[in-house]
Amino acid sequence: MKKLLSVLTAVMILLSAVFSANTVNAKNDKVQMLPVMSAESKQPDRVWVGTFQLVWNEFADNIIKGPVLFKDGTPEVAKQLNRQSFKKSMLSEDSYYTAYGKTTLELKKQIEDAIMAKFNETSDILDKIDWEDPNNAYLIYSMLKKDFNYTTRFDILAKEKFNNSKTKYEYFGIDEKNNDRDNDGVKVLFYNNPFDYAVALQAEKDEVILYRTNSNNNFKSVYEDINKKAAKYKGSKTFVKGDKLKVPFITLKEETNYKELCGHEILNTDRLYIGQALNTVDFNMNNTGIKLKSEAAMSIMKMSLVIPQKLKGRNFYFNNTFILFLKEKDKSMPYYAMRVQDMELYKYTGEVK
């Protein structure tokens, strides 16, 4: 089977009149982080990155030795995580780090030393763990780091509105002034009409897939939809003279704790439960490339007492609702997905520090 693209960033709008049991509730004033690509959500702006799935996999495979099931009933999102639809094999080894063990200060130092040596990075979440809690059992951790340039350095275009906004935002791309030849830095996946198209910005090992759509489906369904449409498309997949491209600069920094997974006694364990289920993302996209840093951690606790439950020239303009995926070129699945509807939530502030 052909492996997934190396880095995909997807921006999706997932609004629906009817929501399934695995729908994740969210506020409407921020970007929502999702634990799995297949999660449904009421939040228009949302993002998924594969780091939390990696943490879940390590816990299930190396500590639980099987699926993670809760004594008081396993929620749909946990069932989806148990399917392990994203794995380390879908990433290049130099782009991620994972660790697990007893929750000790020695493990914390081991992780800090490892991510500094491998990525020259520090952690934003390890200090959120209470390393001296007497109920500590295990800590599982992962980091994903991507920093790449496109094969084409795109021009900075004039500011304009996004999705009928009042504010004007920065864009990069290719316009009629600088498109006098074919451009192999942009691969056309399909162009069905002025409201339904997708392209892939090329890097050496990764690509950025941009899909113009108003779809409310989950990221997994949308990614499958892209592949189906690309396979059926009979038009030119070369970005040719006369084609134009417009993409917004984006900065996103978010952190979440998946509380729906916390506080439930885990079956077939000695009274273990998830204390915290943390996930972060720092994402930056400009005219030269992508910077992405994401962490995830699960603190596993041991219950001491009962705890509370808790056709002519085509215009590839991404100035309206769109979805972005990041993936490695030789992999079959994306490791990042994002749906963008409200640009106020993604105001470009410069490179992620």
Annotated model-derived regions:
Residues 9, 13-17:
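Hydrophobic core
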Residues 22-353:
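Hydrophobic-core positions in well-structured secondary-structure elements of globular domains
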Residues 1-4:
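Positively charged n-region of N-terminal signal peptides that target proteins for export
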